[in-house]
Amino acid sequence: MPLTRRFLGAILCLAALSTLIAVVPPIAAAAGAENAIATLVAKPVSLPDMALGQPAAPITIVEYSSLTCPHCAAFSENVFPMLQSKYIDTGKVRFVSREFPLDIKAAAASMLARCVGNGDAIRYFDIVGQLFKQQEPLVSRTLDTLNAIGDHFGMNEAAVEACVKDQVLLDKLTADQKFAVEALKAEATPTFFINGEMLKGAMSFEELDAKLAGLLKR
């Protein structure tokens, strides 16, 4: 299957991302670092933010996630729907999804999500949700899964291959992840910034609900 071999080669070219994660040390914290991070996290770097919710919402949540991260998938499937219903759709929260691929397969999936979304946040969140639901086959049968999901969103195999070979997109993805590691001190997934405050690791909806309710009372 020539396409599969070429496609695999394209994915393997993403190995630089995993190298980046391993070798870039976090910047040492300084006085006022938390306020500085809150300012930095508010602005996208290379890729435009994919966000749901009102821009003027009182709370902004930025999530850094990897499409091969089980805790990220659990958040997407079990927590995000309730967050969207109670807070995003009611104008209380603006939710921003940013990529932090922890391996080559997650990087390829992130690139596909960007290509499918093409600047449309609703479409982007739709494919990200599908990729999380298909996480097991994404990890075990990466090529077939990316092609199948791409096909579901109207991309043939040639278009999927072209997407994961897009050097400009890869460079932007790499730059954004480098920024998250160096400037924001993000080290793992999921990492959340809620109005600039970093929260690491998985959260139940009950934990997140309590946090957001407290912020809205201020």
Where are these regions (language model features)?
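C-terminal cap of thioredoxin/glutaredoxin-like
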Residues: 2-6, 29-35, 40, 64-66, ...
